[in-house]
């Protein structure tokens, strides 16, 4: 659990140094997107394999792939290599959290799991806070490569504990139909979409055959994905659940917040290090208030939801986050890290409340047997939104940065990556040009923050889609049986980090238990 949360936050603070050393700012977004897309596509596979071949064996296999990917990332000597290795690392990352949650469901009773969730909350919160700090410290004092190597001792320790200590309970092994067509079409349409969004208007004209073909191919593969999911006996994404208004609203809001959240998290360290001129360690400290905001929202969000209901909590969360997003658009070369930390407190509090409400609204709108599936849909859409959001933010920033650097250095062939390498920036950029470079990056990243604020505003408009009811009411209305959300809501406070908030609710009431229910309906919960 610690490793999953740590890996989700540790890389961002090292990215300015990485792209500076590897000279690949044009591929900035793909370091995040490749990891997310690989993780999204493989989580359902790992979940099914765990049912078919045993939790321990599959967990160790996934951890091995993740650790090999971490070593390869640390050995990368070009951006293309790093992107490829990040995708490989994402294949293993898709196993760690969901299979660990399933192991928890196997080992503990429902009553015990309620207590265990408190431990998970503490672990996720702690890892999410120290992740950026560790990433910055390692980058400044050792090398950016250590943000990947640090996974190795933690991962080995976890694998040894599982291997030696865990006694896997006897259980029926379930055969599953793997939705290979769904996986292939999902990867196809998302990769083509991310490619078009990231390179359109910058590397290729929007009207060019490359971009038009990519977008057309994405639409065709999306249609194929929908058809595949409708026909599959065990789909990655059970589309029938989108007929439920509360779940549909939660998915839309989760997508928009994923786009906003990942856009801010991925590019804010770049602003702190390049524009303000601080170290990677300072950039890590700047992100800490965002994670603290998530923790506070997690601690009180469940109780608040019981009092005010879904729509009011979402509206309150957006009302908190939008001022923070707006203040981020006001940052410039004269801003301080204290100002950014202040802004991120509001963003973290707001996002924490909204994401918690989305997850519980989705869970509360379905039967207990489908609760894990609903949780997975919300998490799936958030991560998918994150991959798309990072691509959009990168396109906006790089397009603006190219124009601004061209204006600042007319006639010069400027490589923006030169300004990001601590070892070379002072030699290659004359002191007189440093201010122009800072202003160019500031203006470009301003466009990123404006884009994030617009996405957040769209989320506010979607508040009306969210049901008014309080926990328990939606399931009563939809299914006419006793609500179980009251047992879930207080412990849903474990949604404390950008990479983990939806999975935490899954193990509480939606985990698949061998021999019970219908595996095909529950497994897709691991698609997030």
Language-model features: where?
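Transmembrane-helix exit segments and adjacent C-terminal regions of multi-pass membrane proteins
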Residues: 227, 246, 360, 423-528
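C-terminal membrane-cytosol helix-exit motif in multi-pass small-molecule transporters
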Residues: 153-171, 188-199, 218-231, 459-467
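A membrane-interface helix-boundary motif in multi-pass transporters
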Residues: 140-152, 199-210, 279, 399-453
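Transmembrane core module of solute transporters
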Residues: 2-45, 143, 181-183, 190, ...
């Amino acid at each position: 659990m610690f490793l999953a949360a740590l890996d989700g936050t540790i890389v961002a603070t090292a990215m300015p140094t990485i792209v500076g050393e590897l000279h690949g700012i044009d591929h900035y977004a793909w370091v995040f997107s490749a990891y997310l897309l690989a993780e999204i596509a493989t989580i359902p596979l790992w979940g099914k394999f765990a049912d078919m071949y045993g939790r321990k064996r599959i967990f160790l296999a996934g951890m091995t792939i993740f650790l090999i990917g971490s070593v390869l990332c640390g050995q990368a000597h070009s951006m293309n290599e790093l992107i490829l290795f990040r995708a490989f690392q994402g294949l293993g990352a898709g196993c760690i959290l969901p299979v660990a949650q399933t192991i928890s469901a196997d080992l503990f009773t429902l009553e015990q799991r309620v207590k265990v969730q408190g431990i998970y909350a503490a672990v996720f919160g702690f890892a999410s806070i120290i992740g950026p700090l560790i990433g910055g410290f390692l980058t400044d004092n050792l090398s950016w490569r250590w943000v990947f190597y640090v996974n190795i001792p933690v991962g080995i320790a976890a694998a040894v504990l599982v291997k030696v200590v865990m006694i896997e309970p006897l259980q029926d092994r379930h055969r599953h139909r793997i939705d290979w067509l769904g996986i292939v079409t999902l990867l196809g349409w998302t990769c083509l979409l991310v490619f078009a969004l990231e390179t359109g208007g910058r590397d290729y004209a929007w009207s060019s055959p490359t971009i038009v073909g990519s977008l057309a191919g994405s639409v065709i593969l999306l249609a194929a994905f929908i058809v595949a999911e409708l026909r599959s006996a065990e789909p990655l994404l059970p589309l029938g659940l989108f007929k439920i208004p509360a779940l549909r609203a939660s998915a839309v809001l989760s997508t928009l917040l994923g786009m906003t959240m990942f856009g801010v998290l991925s590019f804010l360290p770049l602003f702190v290090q390049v524009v303000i001129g601080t170290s990677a360690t300072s950039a890590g400290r700047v992100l800490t208030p965002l994670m603290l905001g998530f923790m506070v929202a997690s601690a009180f969000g469940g109780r608040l939801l019981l009092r005010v209901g879904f729509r009011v909590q979402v509206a309150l969360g957006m009302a908190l986050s939008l001022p923070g997003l707006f203040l981020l658009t006001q940052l410039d070369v004269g801003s301080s890290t204290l100002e950014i930390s202040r802004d991120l407190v509001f963003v973290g509090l707001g996002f924490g409340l909204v994401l918690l409400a989305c997850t519980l609204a989705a869970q509360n709108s379905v039967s207990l047997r489908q609760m894990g599936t609903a949780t997975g849909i919300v998490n799936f859409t958030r991560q998918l939104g994150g991959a798309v959001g990072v691509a959009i933010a990168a396109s906006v920033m790089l397009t603006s940065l190219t124009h601004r650097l061209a204006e600042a250095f007319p006639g010069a062939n400027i490589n923006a990556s030169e300004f990001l390498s601590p070892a070379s920036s002072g030699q290659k950029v004359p002191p007189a040009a440093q201010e122009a470079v800072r202003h160019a990056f500031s203006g470009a990243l301003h466009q990123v923050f404006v884009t994030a604020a617009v996405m957040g505003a769209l989320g506010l408009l979607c508040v009306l889609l969210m049901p008014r009811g309080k926990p328990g009411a939606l399931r009563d209305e939809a299914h006419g049986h006793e609500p179980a959300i009251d047992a879930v809501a207080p412990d849903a406070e474990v949604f404390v980090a950008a990479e983990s908030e939806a999975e935490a609710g899954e193990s509480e009431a939606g985990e698949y238990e061998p021999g019970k229910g219908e595996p095909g309906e529950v497994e897709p919960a691991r698609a997030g």
